[in-house]
A protein has these predicted regions:
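Acidic, mature catalytic/reactive cores of soluble proteins
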Residues: 1-187
Length: 187
């Protein structure tokens, strides 16, 4: 099996789209996606505990989860018919070598609430969405293509420079800022 994976953060939204395309397969193929969840701030690490809510709640095209009160819901949806198999379980000791090299703690436990399963055929693309808002699964392919089109071509030095500079401009209402240290300051 040869599978292509493309990730896109959607501009001005808290949404990640992941497109999987089956480029080659010699037999019937099933795609199984098992999201690992942390629900923590960017400086903390998650450890297995009895307080995490491992339940998943059905929404169109997927499920929503919130491991702890006070966090937003995480909506995970697919643009194709799929089955979500609830199977909550902790996975232990994920290692972040870069963090350890920097002198920070670098081991984390992550909870999975289950997995998505769908059939996929050669040449087919499937889009998986993670967002703090529920979306219409029927629009995921359009959203992916629009985000691709919105991005500038980075074919020469000047267009690369413009693209890089835009990543450090943050707008909050009518206020515009240039951020130093992005994204570590939460802007």
């Amino acid at each position: 099996v040869v599978l292509k994976k493309e990730l896109l953060w959607i501009h001005s939204r808290t949404q990640l789209l992941i497109r999987y395309t089956l480029l080659d397969a010699r037999s019937d193929t099933q795609l199984r996606l098992r999201p690992f969840l942390a629900f923590r701030d960017r400086h903390g690490l998650s450890k297995a505990n009895l307080f995490a809510d491992g339940r998943s709640y059905p929404i169109p095209g997927g499920v929503r989860n919130r491991l702890y009160e006070g966090f937003p819901w995480l909506h995970m949806q697919m643009n194709v018919p799929c089955e979500f198999v609830a199977a909550p379980d902790w996975y232990y000791n994920f290692e972040y070598a870069e963090e350890i090299d920097r002198g920070y703690p670098g081991h984390e436990d992550l909870l999975t609430t289950g997995y998505f399963e769908t059939d996929i055929v050669k040449g087919q693309s499937v889009i998986f969405s993670c967002s703090t808002e529920e979306v219409d699964p029927a629009t995921l392919e359009k959203d992916f293509m629009e985000e691709l089109a919105r991005r500038s071509n980075k074919i020469d030095f000047l267009s690369c420079l413009r693209h890089s500079a835009r990543q450090f401009i943050v707008r909050h209402g009518d206020k515009t800022e240039v951020v130093a240290g992005y994204p570590w300051f939460g802007r």
